[in-house]
Amino acid sequence: MVIVSRYAQGAKSYDDDAITAFGNKLFTTSISLLHGFHYTDAMVIYRIYSTKLIKELDLDKDESYETEEKLFGTNISWEPLLSIRAAKRGLKIAEIPGDEPARDGGERKLQVLRWGAAYMYQNIREIFVWK
């Protein structure tokens, strides 16, 4: 899997504010420490991977998300879980620097507290489940 990192050397996110920058740093650091791969951007959507990886890592199964989604009343994306499970499997992972442009109109739909709680719960839960 190749990740286009907003925080790798020379790259910048022009869409981040103080809260999202802090959250990305917090989750990327915790995923790196808990699951064994040093990421610079474990949350980003910009990635290249084989579609068979989705099935290999059970990302296509509702049970991979349903506990967090029910507990915190929100839908979450698979990018953090993809980062976690790829690291746990010891898969080839590379990061390349890439800028994230500023948001071009529209409103951010970020649910900071719900998503933050759901992703942290998922991150910790993955220590004990899905081998």
Where are these regions (language model features)?
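Charged/polar positions on well-ordered alpha helices
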Residues: R85-K88, A118, Q122
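A general structural signal for well-ordered alpha-helical segments in protein cores
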Residues: G23, F27, E79-I84
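Catalytic donor-sugar/metal-binding loop of nucleotide-sugar-dependent glycosyltransferases
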Residues: F37, D60-K61, P80-P101
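Histidine-centered beta-alpha loop that forms part of the nucleotide-sugar donor binding/catalytic region
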Residues: R6-Y7, I76, G98
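Acceptor/aglycone-binding surface of glycosyltransferases and processive sugar-polymer synthases
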Residues: M1-K70, R103-Q111, M120, I124
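Acidic donor-binding loop at a coil-to-helix junction in glycosyltransferase catalytic cores
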Residues: Y65-L82
